[in-house]
Amino acid sequence: MFAQTFKMRGKRTVDFTPVRPRRTLPLLAASVLLIGQAWIADRTVYSGTKDAITWSAVFTWIQRDWPQVAQISTRELAERMAAGNESAPLLIDVRTREEYGVSHLPGAIWAETPDQIASASRERSDRQPVVVYCSVGVRSSKAAARLMRSGRTNVFNLQGSIFKWANEGRPLMANGSAVHVVHPYSERWGVLLDSQLHPPQAEKAMD
């Protein structure tokens, strides 16, 4: 590449050297596109109105963001729990203490923070499967991915988590007794939980 300059009469020298195209605009455009795609993907969780969350959209979101996390169905988990042998997994409830206090899966232990979750998993053999769950599977998929990065194997997320489990009429416990309610997490996410499973106080809060 060489410079080409010309003197125009009565004016300054003009440089016609070819200029490499700047990459700033393409990079900026690509960044905006990626952000836009992520925003659109997240919006697909909602169908129609902001409160109309669908299960299919939630499952798609989880698969998109945590494809490395294996999913276990509520049916398979129930079968493993009933077998009561080495296939019975360690159940970790990663919701808040308040949510866990309303109800949880039988035998599940509560561990909300990353350190608590890691500590709970270390107390069991590496050969024992670990199943984590939350309300619908978003928080627990994130927790499962973190456990896997720490080196833990045989980790699963409960697909649909406690909402789907309860919607199917499967057993729930609280303070050692069977219950039939689940913390709805929030008004928006609570639409995925059958209305008869909402605690009375939660229903009042949503009115």
Predicted regions and their residues:
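N-terminal secretory signal peptides that target proteins for export/translocation
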Residues: 1-19
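Rhodanese-like catalytic fold shared by cysteine-dependent sulfurtransferases
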Residues: 2, 9, 23-82, 101-128, ...
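Structural scaffold elements adjacent to functional motifs in cytosolic proteins
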Residues: 89-93
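Short, polar loop motifs at secondary-structure junctions
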Residues: 94-99
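Residue-level detector of alpha-helix initiation sites
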Residues: 137-138
